[in-house]
């Protein structure tokens, strides 16, 4: 997954 990506939030 890309840095800073979570399945819960993307900012």
UniProtKB/Swiss-Prot annotation:
Pfam families per record: Bradykinin (PF06753)
Listed GO MF terms: hormone activity; toxin activity
Keywords recorded for this protein, A-Z: Amphibian defense peptide, G-protein coupled receptor impairing toxin, Hydroxylation, Secreted, Toxin, Vasoactive, Vasodilator
Domain of life: Eukaryota
BP GO terms, sorted: defense response; vasodilation
GO cellular component terms attached to this protein's record: extracellular region
Tissue: Expressed by the skin glands.
PTM-bearing positions, type 4-hydroxyproline: 2
The keyword Protein transport appears for this protein: no
InterPro entries hit by this protein: Bradykinin
Localization, UniProt: Secreted
Family listed: Belongs to the bradykinin-related peptide family.
Function (record text): May produce in vitro relaxation of rat arterial smooth muscle and constriction of intestinal smooth muscle. May target bradykinin receptors (BDKRB).
Protein name: [Val1,Hyp2,Thr6]-bradykinyl-Gln,Ser
